Regions:
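Alpha-helix N-cap/helix-initiation sites
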Residues: 134-139, 173-177, 226, 382-386, ...
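N-terminal nucleic-acid engagement/recognition segments and initiation subdomains in replication
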Residues: 1-128, 136, 153, 206-212, ...
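Short, well-ordered alpha-helical segments
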Residues: 121, 139, 178, 182, ...
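Feature primarily recognizes SF3-like P-loop helicase cores of small DNA viruses
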Residues: 144, 153-160, 164, 187-235, ...
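P-loop NTPase catalytic core of nucleic-acid-dependent motor ATPases
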Residues: 95-214, 392
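Structural motif
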Residues: 130-141, 298-305, 403
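Active/binding-pocket-proximal capping segment
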Residues: 235-236, 412
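Short beta-strand micro-motifs enriched in acidic
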Residues: 423-425
Length: 457
């Protein structure tokens, strides 16, 4: 007959004397191997390769029961009071992750030990399974994987916009844009899916959820928007800390070590969004019934070798000298320079940013349209012309029929002073000033008139 081994006790009293919260915490941490820890402001316990929150006293004491028999007595520290005081005696971290950063980031608790750096070639083998449009896109896909693991500063990672040229019969559909993002994000726990039209509160609640802690890639999939612009999304990309309301907790924060990915056919972004983006193009792949399973198997079976290769690139491989940088200098130095042809890739990236910048394209169209209107009204564009703001807004709306007058005015204000000069007359009348290329400085201005059609309005 087997005699059961007596369990250790965890009690708020010793020899009938009450124990302080500090002594109880010291005893608990010794029992559990220095757990729980405070992560993102919340008590957490280990859970496989990750962590799980302990949001209330019942959860905490259920966890303690794994290690000792809980005997809580009257007259000692109440459970609720111990739960409230325990965080002050535990190790604190901003974030926890089962996946490494290279170099490791301060304030992040890593629940697993990473492989040593080694030039295994497995990273190139993985990237080679995809269908980049050019050799430079292959390099940018590799840079995207390195970015997932890069231990760089908060909010200093570009958005990766995965798209196609759209010249094939399917117009870019079925090229594997989403598959590229999701499969490679599997190296670091998978994606956090965001909806463009979701509210700010909803978006931040998703990002701050403990279930999202182990994932570090945010995906906006299959974007369908002309001139995609979002103050919220643009702010998320560059902020150092993501703050908001966490369900059943209250105020919460996480450091912004996330990488943002957008998949889109025919990318058309605002200027701010275009400048934040690195455009990666893919082409229609050669179909294979086993490609997906084989690629997933490569990641599952050779994860250590792939990550060892990533670590070698980020920590051991000397970076190539860059001829310049863009708005992401830390990323260029820490990631892009570790690829084979960083200067050529950087030049291509700048070209593609200009190509997807809908603001520049719209501005050129508006200038051409205004030039036509000036020529019709003044017989020559080589003049100085004062155009009333409402008339100029009307001209913009002739070209952009989706604009309201307010939107047209906002668009014009964004163009000033790069294209038109704004002028307010002493009488209070407001104008945009058109100055033709051949107009002399002393050329007297022509003032156009405009009457508001109240009936039409």
């Amino acid at each position: 007959m087997t005699i059961p081994t007596p369990r250790k006790e965890f009690s708020n009293k010793s020899n009938n004397a009450s124990l302080s919260i500090k002594k109880l915490a010291t005893h608990l941490l010794k029992l559990t191997g220095n757990w729980p820890k405070v992560i993102s402001g919340q008590l957490c316990a280990p859970d496989g390769d990750g962590v799980m929150p302990l949001p209330d006293p019942p959860c905490l004491f259920a966890y303690i029961d794994r290690f000792a028999e809980v005997k809580w007595r009257r007259g000692g520290v109440p459970k609720a009071e111990f739960f409230a005081g325990l965080p002050h005696n535990c190790e604190r971290y901003e974030w926890a992750s089962p996946h490494p950063h290279f170099p490791p980031l301060p304030g992040v608790y890593y629940t697993t030990k990473p492989p040593l750096p080694a030039n295994t070639g497995k990273l190139d083998e993985l990237v080679a399974r995809f269908s980049p449009a050019t050799e430079y896109d292959r390099l940018l896909i590799k840079a995207m994987v390195l970015t997932f693991f890069w231990g760089g500063p908060k909010g200093k990672r570009p958005v990766f916009a995965i798209t196609t040229d759209g010249g094939d019969a399917k117009k870019g559909r079925g090229a594997g844009k989403t598959t590229l993002a999701e499969v490679l994000a599997g190296l670091v726990g998978g994606v956090i899916g965001l909806q463009v039209r979701a509210s700010t509160d909803r978006t931040r609640a998703v990002l701050l959820s403990p279930a999202a802690w182990g994932r570090r890639v945010v995906l906006i999939d299959n974007l369908k928007s002309y001139r995609f612009s979002s103050d919220e999304f643009e702010g998320l990309v560059t902020c150092e800390e993501i703050t908001g309301h966490r369900l059943h907790h209250g105020f919460a924060a996480r450091p912004n070590y996330l990488t943002y990915v957008v998949t889109v056919n025919g990318a058309s972004f605002s200027k701010d969004m275009a400048e934040r983006s690195v455009v990666v193009k893919v082409k229609q792949p050669t179909t294979s019934p086993t490609w997906y399973a084989d690629t997933r198997a490569l990641i599952t079976e050779h994860w250590d070798e792939i990550v060892a290769d990533v670590r070698w690139h980020l920590v051991k491989k000397p970076g190539m000298k860059l001829n310049g940088t863009d708005r992401w200098p830390d990323w260029c130095r820490g990631v892009l320079s570790k690829t084979d042809k960083p200067n050529a890739a950087l030049k291509l990236t700048e070209q593609r940013r200009r190509a997807i910048d809908a603001d520049d394209g719209d501005e050129e169209d508006v200038v051409d349209h205004v030039r036509t209107r000036i020529a019709a009204a003044c017989e020559s564009v080589d003049r100085v012309v004062w155009v009333p703001v409402l008339l100029m807004a009307k001209w913009v709306m002739e070209l952009r029929r989706d604009f309201t007058q307010h939107q047209a005015s906002q668009f014009l204000r964004a163009m000033v002073p790069r294209v038109f000069q704004y002028h307010r007359h002493s009488a209070g009348t407001r104008y945009y000033v058109w100055r033709g290329k051949e107009a002399e400085p002393s050329t007297p201005p022509i003032t156009l008139s405009y009457e508001v059609n109240n009936a039409a309005h």
